[in-house]
Amino acid sequence: MASTRMAHISTATSSSSFPIHGLLPKQATKVESFREKFPNYDGRNVRVAVLDTGVDPAALGLDGPNKVVDIIDCSGAGDVKLQEVAAKFNADRSTLQLVSPTTKRTLLVDPSWPNPSGVWKVGTKRAYDLWPTSLVERRTRERKQAFDVSHSALFQKALDDLATYEANEGAEKPSDKNAAAQHHEDLKARVAVLKDLAKNWKDPGPVLEAVVFHDGVNWRAVVGGAEGDVVDPSQGEPAAYRHNVIDLRSKPRMTDYRLEREWSYFGEMDLLTFSVNIVGDGDVLSIVTLSGTHGTHVAGIIGAKTQDLSLIHI
């Protein structure tokens, strides 16, 4: 994923007339003479802590091996309390099913995942509680557009059903008048409820589900539920919004970032990078992500390095 993005940026830069050599002017700042005098003063064996809005390990120049060595959340915003839950096989024993204690959604996990203890822990987190404001605003707009399309179809049908009934009112037999009156009130109530729903719509955002287990060596976490598929809001809400099953079987099983330096995205719709740390004896999952862009900007100034864009390096 990162290599594809790198190739795209490299191609765009090489074919552009934008003067990237002026972004970090080496002559005016005497960097070239400094490097000639001290060729080994290039940051080797130096570790810098950036206490800021978070650092994106997928950012260009920071995604190399051993570049970002650890990422932690000092705010506690990404903490997810975990509860042990029972697991059961599906009918053909190809999938393990867990039930989220908070949302009651069914979570599907792969029984081939190493878990010698057989202990599965589950936690829930509102995505908007830890996503940056700019992303929340964008996803809210997109989700509102999808809602409006779906709502318009339902509202129009309710209006049509009411109009059809009222056009034929009086055709019912005397014995059916009570039932007909009740049906009429029901049709009017549907229109009123849908009208009120549009007026008072609020977006709670995606609800994340996390499963944590110990593979015999390390604690591992799998996170899902962030609407991973790219959808066109103009086509209305996807059916997946209403599903009560979260399939985690294809999600990465991540451990503490410092151990394997692995990160992922919540979903294709948000493309927000996150990593994890499991605290204590698997009691709390810390989902580590970004609250803004400044921390990544600072980290890039400190240590970003890309071979294809050497002109912009100090």
Predicted feature descriptions by range:
Residues 312-314:
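Conserved small/polar residues in nucleotide/adenosyl-binding loops
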